[in-house]
């Protein structure tokens, strides 16, 4: 038995297993070699820098094993022929500050996605297997300021690149023999694409998963030679789902510095734009993670009761490229919160909703977003939900014994540095709680959360109860058996979603509205609480409510 294993890879003959184990803080850091039948395993490499996490995998071509040490801003890869498990691992390119790269293999070349030399949105280069160092890198796809090269899959006769432009993914397919390429684009105004495993190396078919705010998750085979998409399976939505009954939109708000901030929105097709429709507005905005415009059958419960759902694609996420992330981390973090406020003001000004019908939600680092926004502009919102929220930024980032803390200095900064401490203090939700009115708030956490310890939201709620000057409801709900991602059981997770939606619908006066929308959706019913007056950390997925 081997404990705390994070990733594994087998040699070509199946006789040797390479595996990585985690340390006390759940950081993958040691690479071992296990020979079947041997009594002891050999430690090959230990990643001593706590900013870095280690992984191991085998290439799709099956010819090479790769190990990668990666931080939020740097990377260092090594490779080993899969048919030489007792051989020596070879460095590709040593780690450098602000240089991230990924590697794949095809033929006699390594394909490397790199953002070195200041090319923040990445470019694609190739290097000979015999000499993969940076001096031999040859450019295939150049850097483009407004196009993020997100991922690459290499096959025997083609490679497929995931590019993100204006917040949306498209596929770039290149024939290796000729260098000719074409794009695969999709018609909806907002959607999400993810690659399926695609384990076969010699194939013209690329399998992908497509979904949008109104299109259920759908698996397609794309024939790269014939340029045809074949639908293999679409997730069934019970109850006679008709996508034509719903409308999705792509909007843009303008931040205070002139930056255009994307918004994805979905509602019933007959939802009026008169300022009277309730809305759930969600966001994340950290770690360069793009908030997916994905489908949710559970969300129909909100839409069918006249609630519009909107996603704020704010800075700090990855929707608009690497610079979008850079503009919302470290000493730029406040852009994340001011962008969300700008999105809110735009949706109100354009009469998609009004403050008395607006609920906001975020989980983990998205909980930090919601907590910060509530301190800055509580008057804009009627209710808020914070799930496993990272709300005590300074104290958490000062405690290096906690999982993730050291590794996230590159995202938040190290508060032992006075400049970072003062900046964190300017937005930390816990620190900035004050004697002011707040909207109705639900805070949820889990006892077994290893990313955001349960006492962090608990102390936030305790301090908020002491300081807030309103009589609005403040609820604290703790799941005694769940972790950072919520309940693991399917039905437990559905029960949690039902609780959340019931709470949201009650807040906006739609709890008694039937799912067929029998009540008029053009006006808000009297909200349970009057509108107030006045002016995750990653490491475990938190399923978005929206």
Residue ranges and their predicted role:
Residues 311-517:
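Active-site-proximal cap/loop segments of hydrolase catalytic domains
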Residues 516-546:
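Intrinsic disorder/low-complexity segments
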Residues 1-276, 287-305, 332, 345-349, ...:
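Peripheral, non-catalytic segments that deliver or gate enzyme domains
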Residues 279, 303-313, 475:
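A fold-wide structural signal in alpha/beta-hydrolase
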Residues 276-278, 357:
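Conserved catalytic motifs of the protein kinase core domain
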Residues 283-285, 445:
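The conserved beta1-alpha1 loop
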